[in-house]
Amino acid sequence: MKTPKVGFVSLGCPKALVDSERILTQLKTDGYQVASDYDGADLVVVNTCGFIESAVQESLDAIGEAMSENGRVIVTGCLGKDEDKIRQMHPNVLKVTGAAAYQDVMEAVHEYVPAPPKHNPFIDLVPEQGIRLTPKHYAYLKISEGCNHRCTFCIIPSMRGDLVSRPVGSVLEEAAALKRAGVKEILVISQDTSAYGVDTKYKLDFWNGQPVKTKFFDMCEALGQLGIWVRLHYVYPYPHVDAVIDLMAQGKILPYLDIPFQHASPRVLKLMKRPAHSENTLEKIKLWREKCPNLVIRSTFVVGFPGETEEDFQILLDWLVEAQLDRVGCFTYSPVEGATANDLPDHVPEEIKQERYERFMQVQQQISAAKLQKRIGQTMTVLVDSLEDEYPVAVARSYADAPEIDGNVFVEDIDKSTIQPGDMLEVEITDADEYDLFAKLIKIKSV
């Protein structure tokens, strides 16, 4: 009997990527092979995104392609919450499940393509860190599912539910397994990382025989003992974040904080139902930088939110200049089906949204360029992601750069035979542009 094969398409954010990794790991554990193309697959799983309309369309297109090329498709992920929308376009999909519905996906796979008999997962070994879709040297670590906030532009709680934190012992054991597998950078992700453990009332758990609370600070402190890069994403500026800044100042975790501020106008923040006030946030940033001078702050913002006036937008620009954030992403507001913001009055015309986006990015580009110029002459440790095909250049990142969303450090004039992805290098920064740094190699620190 031939081994059944399952094709897999993964769309969406890093949190969805982790969901895909878990499903793939379970498929492998149950004896399935992962097909490299549609033709060789007995069925195809499509993990969808449904956050904004463009992502919904991309997901529907991916389902359509899988149906056309294979014809036996199981749909999961955030868009799976809206089964009617999926079946309206693709009525013959085998099964539709929601986000993080690992067991439902596996039951559907077993139903339509039974697992091979006499499979022994202890003989057909699955790596202890599971199947990963990222390069070997970094990995995403999802610590919770869902969110307790009800931001008016977001439908995540309707797709993924309220906050459910993983037991801290499980989180830390996964992190330790990743380190044993050679991972040198862990990116901590969730919908609201700093709320970790709130739903469990900070329940006591155990790791390596020691008691650890299911709590943001305690988890970060334990992760800091692993001796690898730990990067925090999707953090709200709650008061208890201050204590984690101390860990960064001590070198326990990377001095990098990803906080989606979204706006700075108090009026717009209120319309968004965001749990932060811009003046308090500026004070927080000042305090954090006093504690940890090399702290890098990344954030994302939405311009053209319904009701945003020119005055609101100018408040945002002024705040941006004062905050001097290191890394920034910006999006024009896009209506999301099911978001309560759609019902707000005074929607901003598309041409004004675009004009504000361009003005915003121009201001931030100047801030970013000035900050990177100050790096010239500094010695930094960087992690190599890849090597250029045609040039003697290593594409790397420093502590200030998360993969895929931030800039790179291009280490020039290297001997490519001595360096490979996952190596840690010590470099001197020689030049900079608006988003990237250029460097020369001092030495290879670790391989």
Swiss-Prot record:
Gene Ontology cellular component annotations, sorted alphabetically: cytosol
Q: Which PROSITE patterns match?
A: MTTASE_N, MTTASE_RADICAL, RADICAL_SAM, TRAM
Q: Where in the cell is it found?
A: Cytoplasm
**Domain Radical SAM core: start-end pairs:** 133-370
Specify whether Glycoprotein is a keyword of the entry: no
HAMAP family documented for this protein: MTTase_RimO
Record's function text: Catalyzes the methylthiolation of an aspartic acid residue of ribosomal protein uS12.
Task: List the protein's name.
Answer: Ribosomal protein uS12 methylthiotransferase RimO
